[in-house]
Amino acid sequence: MQLIKSQVIFNQELHTYTLNGVQLQGITGMIGRQLFSNKYANVPQSVLTKAANRGSFIHEVCELTDDLGVFHESEEAKNYNALKTLYGLRYETSEYLVSDNEHFASCIDKVYRESDYEFSLGDIKTTYQLDKEYVRWQLSIYAYLFEMQNPGCKVVRLFAIWLRGNIHELVEIERVPDNVIVDLMAAEISGLQFVNPYSVHVGSNNLPAKYQEMEQSIIEINEQAKYWADKKKELTEGVMKEMVSAGV
């Protein structure tokens, strides 16, 4: 199945999205306003600019590798290729634009094909620390819009592609349910503050933040272990069937 191309026009220089002359909102702005308003409050603008430029460069060299087979000498580009090989990622497209054609639009870093109707979405992160909660919301919104734009298609996996120097990890992310994403968008459209059902309130009964992060990591590791165990079983059964058919 071929993916549907959005009619929304993306101006890369101004980073704006327009449809029939009407400007749509990007996803990053909504996430910042509704969920992570103080994420970079104490970071100097010069540092943010430098990080953004570095991130853009790494995105570009990875895209060159995917689209043109041009292998850049940077460590991140080499590590990205290593991750693709290790996990058997079947590249479909980069910067895939998705939209509800009314309010929101955004470009997905990476789309990988799992089957004729199943896809995985990846987002490249180059930060010092990987903010899994941020990328969870980002990719979940992408998944919702992706399936809306491509009826019959299913997003089966979401993952962050963490590339920073010698760090290269593919981190699978749990999807936020669609009904929660719908509520988030409705709040943004109405000019209301979204109530995050996953937010942790400070109190005597809550675990310290570092233990909460450890607990979340354990959950994600278990989910990844289950996925690859299922894949191993699927491949093993396939080999056995071929051996039986061949009379081995």
Range-by-range predicted roles:
Residues 135-138:
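Short, conserved glycine- and acidic-residue-centered signature motifs
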Residues 58-59, 106-128, 142, 221:
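Conserved catalytic cores of phosphodiester-cleaving nucleases, focusing on short active-site segments
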Residues 13-15, 117, 166:
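Beta-strand-connecting loop/turn residues
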Residues 46-48, 127-130:
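A short glycine/serine-rich beta->alpha loop
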Residues 1-107, 113, 230, 237:
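Metal-dependent nuclease catalytic cores that hydrolyze phosphodiester bonds in DNA/RNA
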